[in-house]
Amino acid sequence: MKKGNKYGVHRVIEPKGVLPQPANKIDNNMDEIYDNEILIDVITLNIDSASFTQIEEQAGGDEQKIAEIMLGIVEKQGKHRNPVTGSGGMLLGIVEKIGTALEGKTDLKVGDKIATLVSLSLTPLRIDKIKAIRKDIDQVDIDGKAILFESGIYAKIPADMPEKLALSALDVAGAPAQTAKLVKPGDTVLIIGAGGKSGMLCCYEAKKRAGVTGKVIGLCHSEKSTKRLIELGFCDHVFAADATQPVAVLEKIEELTNGQMADITINNVNITDTEMTSILCTKDTGIVYFFSMATSFTKAALGAEGVGSDVTMIVGNGYTRGHAEITLELLRESDKLRKVFTELYA
């Protein structure tokens, strides 16, 4: 086997000298793997929410066109990085082959079922056939292969829950795990996109961390997700609003917090133009955590400057130590969460 680079630079075709994620094209030839790679037989792609929403809109909801767009992305780039959003997703698959340099260094063995916890935007991918598209949960079943680099992180699918349930939670594992690090007892926390997958997990974790002296406010988009979040009972206040309309949302948060605003705002939406809502609803010394892949650095930075806000803004890193374990544990802890996730995603 050829010797590979830890970060997968050996797979970059164009431009040379960059890492696989920003590369325009990477090598997705799976006939031969490098000595530090893991070959995966792919079962399901879990497309990033912002990416899938964009593809679905471009395709007008037509499944055949969604498939064509996805195949075109992979054919052109050797990976699934949405050219509009720049985001990818992650995958579920079975370990097919392990490079010789990783023998004795990894706890994986051939036949293990895993979820990759690195983005599809940097993962060499070959799609042989698209078998099923589940638009409601952003998942696509395929026949195909993928490569996990030596630096790539993963989670073994646990024995105590269905694989699609675990995959759905692991897709957004960074959000609740980062919430656990950020939220302190007594904090007022606003979660934008609270009725979605990452939003529900964050609401549960935020309430656990903020405690009885804290307050969790959930902003949802649809009537359906609002009703669901109210029934879950994780939030002190839940309301439906258009997160792209900052003034209206600001007025509502002023009312709910008696003008104190949020200590922490966590943005989980999959649409653009919600930066100012996040910033305006957060107190001057507070924190805005942008987990959304639809976030614009320019809009957030210039927007905060434009309204004289001194908030600390954090780019949502999808990885934090122990994030997979933390997130799966939430589904074990909360029967309500597990029931909803099972109904929606499993």
Over which residues does each language-model region extend?
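Short amphipathic alpha-helix with an adjacent loop that forms part of the alpha/beta core around
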Residues: P246-Q260
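Mid-domain Rossmann-like dinucleotide-binding core that forms the NAD(H)/NADP(H) cofactor-binding site
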Residues: A159-A240
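A short N-terminal beta-strand-loop micro-motif at the entrance of redox/enzyme domains
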Residues: E14-F52, E56
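C-terminal capping/lid region of NAD(P)-dependent oxidoreductase domains
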Residues: G259, L328-A346
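Glycine-rich phosphate-binding loop and adjacent beta-alpha segment
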Residues: V269-S334
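Conserved "cap/hinge" positions at secondary-structure junctions
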Residues: G99, V118-S119, P124, G193, ...
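Glycine-rich beta-strand-centered segment in the early N-terminal region that forms part
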Residues: D31-N46, Q58-L120
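NAD(P)H dinucleotide-binding glycine-rich loop of Rossmann-like/cofactor-binding domains
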Residues: G89, I114-G186
